[in-house]
From Swiss-Prot:
Its EC number is 2.7.7.4. With CysN forms the ATP sulfurylase (ATPS) that catalyzes the adenylation of sulfate producing adenosine 5'-phosphosulfate (APS) and diphosphate, the first enzymatic step in sulfur assimilation pathway. APS synthesis involves the formation of a high-energy phosphoric-sulfuric acid anhydride bond driven by GTP hydrolysis by CysN coupled to ATP hydrolysis by CysD. It catalyses: sulfate + ATP + H(+) = adenosine 5'-phosphosulfate + diphosphate. Pfam families: PAPS_reduct. This is Sulfate adenylyltransferase subunit 2. InterPro entries: PAPS_reduct_dom (IPR002500), Rossmann-like_a/b/a_fold (IPR014729), SO4_adenylTrfase_ssu (IPR011784), Sulfate_adenylyltrnsfr_sub2 (IPR050128). Keywords: ATP-binding, Nucleotide-binding, Nucleotidyltransferase, Transferase. One of its GO terms (molecular function) is sulfate adenylyltransferase (ATP) activity. Residues 279-302 are annotated as: Disordered. Pathway: Sulfur metabolism; hydrogen sulfide biosynthesis; sulfite from sulfate: step 1/3. Belongs to the PAPS reductase family. CysD subfamily.
């Protein structure tokens, strides 16, 4: 097919589908990470297209921290039932036994124990040799230098200086036993591309992305949604009801909402056309310290 005849989004779609099929053919035991967010929803949609009319030939894995928004978990279970894919859910048993919490232990330790260590446990448990992720290069500076095929050693660590060249869209998936590849089919998409594709393809998303009146607390410069009774108010804080939505979704105590009136997909796209900041600015874990995302990725974070 002549690339010149493809629209921008169709070119991105074709590239992503090619990557999905390449990994399914090349690796013995791939898995798709499913974080329930907008990028995961697009990646799932692309996987369904890539292997239609057959079923997706690999499971989806959600590393659950026990602190996700309730609407996210409801959406996850409803989506798995609707499309019939194999869904694996893993919670770090040691972290659960210790009662690790973003409130009591801080964002850095919570993320390391419940997400990074939990992910490594799951990858080791099932012996996956390739894992799809929905990260995009426009999200954050350490992700901007990520390869589409991102090599990880036996400890799941990422060394940005020890990666393979990807000339002419040729990917090197050769690994030794115990090593793995993280694969990012959406690398070349932007946040605006994601929203335009969701709109054009009528992809279902978690309602939290759309503006609504929600209970929030202003804390550390972020609007934190009071999603359940585990959110304890600090001195001087009060719950306010504001018209907000989320540009990015994670653990609710670590994810800031933005004030917005965009309660439709066209409204979100209009906001994206004039946005001047990254969606990751709403993630507390990205502000733990300078270079915090790259440090987390070196330790095994996605």
């Amino acid at each position: 097919m002549d690339p010149k005849r493809l629209t921008h989004l169709k070119q991105l779609e074709a590239e992503s589908i090619h990557i999905l099929r390449e990994v399914a053919a090349e690796f013995d035991n791939p898995v798709m990470m499913y974080s329930i967010g907008k990028d995961s929803s697009v990646m799932l949609h692309l996987a369904r297209k890539a292997f239609y009319p057959g079923k997706i030939p690999f499971p989806l894995l959600h590393v659950d921290t026990d602190w996700k928004f309730r609407e996210m978990i409801e959406f996850r279970d409803r989506t798995a039932e609707k499309y019939g894919f194999e869904l694996l859910v893993h919670k770090n048993p040691e972290g659960m036994a210790m009662g690790i919490s973003p409130f009591e232990h801080g964002s850095s330790k919570h993320t390391d124990v419940m997400k990074t260590q939990g992910l490594k446990q799951a990858l080791n448990k099932y012996g996956f040799d390739a894992a799809f992720g929905g990260a995009r290069r426009d999200e954050e500076k350490s992700r901007a230098k990520e390869r589409i095929y991102s090599f990880r050693d036996k400890n799941h660590s990422w060394d940005p200086k020890n990666q393979r060249p990807e000339l002419w869209k040729t990917y090197n998936g050769q690994i030794n036993k115990g090593e793995s590849i993280r694969v990012f089919p959406l690398s070349n998409w932007t946040e605006l591309d994601i929203w335009q594709y969701i709109y054009l393809e009528s992809i279902e998303i978690v309602p939290l992305y759309l503006s609504d009146i929600r209970p929030v607390v202003e804390r550390d410069g972020m609007l934190i949604m009071a999603d359940d009774d585990r959110l304890k108010l600090q001195p001087g804080e009060k719950i306010e009801y504001k018209s907000v939505r989320f540009r990015t979704l994670g653990c609710y105590p670590l994810t800031g909402a933005i004030e917005s009136k965009a309660d439709t997909l066209p409204g979100i796209i209009e906001e994206m056309l004039v946005a001047t900041s990254s969606e990751r600015q709403g993630r507390a874990i990205d502000h733990d310290q300078s270079g915090s995302m790259e440090l987390k990725k070196r330790q095994g974070y996605f």
